[in-house]
Amino acid sequence: PVEYMYVFIFALFLRPAASAQVANLRSYMRDVLVAAVITAIVSAVFVACYKFINNFGDLLLANEIARDMNAANVMADNAQFLIVIGFYVMLMFIVDRIKDRPVQFGLCVFLLLFFANNQLFDPTRHSRMYAERSFFGLTTVALFQAGDDYVIRMIHGITTHGQQSQNPEKKLHPTAYYAPLKLFIKSIDRSVSHSPYAVMGLGAGTLACVGHKSQHVDFFEIDPVVIHMAENTKYFTYLKDCPTKSTVILGDGRLKIAEAKDHKYSFIVMDAFTSDAIPTHLITREALATYRQKITKNGFIAFNISNRHIDLRYVLAKLARNAGMNAILLHDDGTSDPLYFSSTWVVLTHDDHFYTKLSKYVTDSMYIKDLNELNTSSTSLWSDNFTNILETLKVLRNFREN
């Protein structure tokens, strides 16, 4: 998306219809200077107001005028929102006045988009504790309030990749999307329940706490920034304090897990998906064949498919049917605890009794479905040679079903 924005702005600089307005280098340089001055003035005033609002929010918290952290943040949010909108109105006025000057117009539109991207759509701007960018995008650590508890969350883009309660009694509880995993583990055969397990996608390291003391977990993580944050005990202590021993392996999860011994893991958790990007190479026929080789006879592979825009149920059901496996969906609406999120999981297993065993543990906030009943005749069988992300879009799926 960032690249598209740059192309759009570049196109604004080169509008043929307005080329007559900038006939020589002096005109271009004058336009650049004017746009630079506008940018400098607006940025300086904006940053000053931004810092004032942030300091005002901190002052509210420090003096306990607003004891609820969210209340202080909402007040700061509202004030900052008005400031941002005010600047947008001013910028739109400027843009309208210079719409026939490509350089001025392009630079001012860039400023507008920059503020929109970094201020209006940044949910962590008041509570951010740390942020770092890598090849895979911006990852942020921020403090939030969840019910009566405070939590530290790891956020990549707009997707939460784990959180940890600051309540000592709940500090090692698997929260966020991971409540259903406890039920999956209860449903596994006791004979393999103490075998090692694997997780693709480290996040905050939450899943180190779903195993037993005698177990070992291998985390596969492709982003070194995520590893750095998860191992920093200033923010998250799962890897340090959870009873399960853990190893973090840097690299592409599919390639790295292929190096493990066959039938090593009692289960594999696929938690590498976000709303912004779906690593389709992790959910192909060939990838599933690799995972099947690495789990025990009646182990399982759990896919976290929680997503605003993408529905992977049919793709996974098709893959399971092709591999002779059972596919089970479990949705948790997240209402049983303020620390839980709404989440959707699909489990693939060779255990024909897994659905029956899992059904015994399903709570009122959960919904379970046997995906073997889905009609997947119109769904593509994803492979390393072919995937079709369009068929997974929820808006298209809902349109076809209605």
Annotate each language-model stretch with its function:
Residues D370-L371, N375:
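Extracellular/surface-exposed low-complexity segments
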Residues P1-S365, S377, D384-N402:
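Alpha-helical transmembrane segments of multi-pass membrane proteins
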